[in-house]
Structures are given as C-alpha cells and as structure tokens.
Amino acid sequence: MKTVKKISGGESWNCTSLGNKSLIKGKINKWKIQIIKLIGSITFGIVPKGIDINGVNNWMKGYITCSGNFYKHNLGVVIKPHTISAGEGSILETIVDLEKGVLSFSMNGNNLGIFCDNIIKDIEYIPFLDIYNEGTEVRLL
C-alpha cells in the first residue's frame, strides 16, 4: 500500500496524484483510498488520461471533501449532495462502470448513489487524488 502525504506547498490544489493505468473499457473498475490524517480538503475520482495536472479541476468527476463534508464536483460545477462526512479512518471507494457509463462512490461500504450516468465511454480515464492542506495523508488501498 502506498501513502500520499502533502508536506509542502501551502493551501492549494497542488498535490495531484494520477493513476498510472487506464480504466478497463467495458468493465467495472474499483479502487479505494483511506483517510489517515485529514487537515482540510481532498478530491478524488476520475479524469481523462493525458490531462495537464493544472487542468484537473476543469475535467474531474468526483468528490471534494471540504473538512470532511462531501461536495460533488462535475466538470467545474460544485454542489453539496450529501449530509455525510468523512474523517480519519474513512475508506472511500470509486466505482466506474465503463460499459454503462456510470460513476458512483461509497464510504465505509455504504453506497453514496450514482454520481453521474453519462460518462463518455470512448475516453480513457485514470484515477486521481488531490490534497489541498499540508499534513493531510491518504493511503491507497
């Protein structure tokens, strides 16, 4: 298991980690992260392969946890869909069905529902994670 910890860079979305393998087309792809230490905010989800790290916020489909509260982030639009909160020890799972074009998430085994059901199936996607606050630490499971 690998750990991602932001140790410098201040408060900014500048600690992006991108997956090194594309999601498998026509399959259900899943991966999990565990929050080890939550100082502030993280984002996690999927982005198109080959994206410029500086453009992640414009192209991401995923959640932002702002001090543990979940905000939906879909291609630059942010809304608050859930009243649940993540904290240290929480396990967050991303589930991508590239056959049906559906993206969903779970926290600690509890399904958070369908995030979106219109993923473009012809694009190659990779997992991503970004950390805003120094000291925040996440384990890749």
Predicted regions and their residues:
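PRY/SPRY (B30.2) beta-sandwich protein-interaction domains
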Residues: 1-141
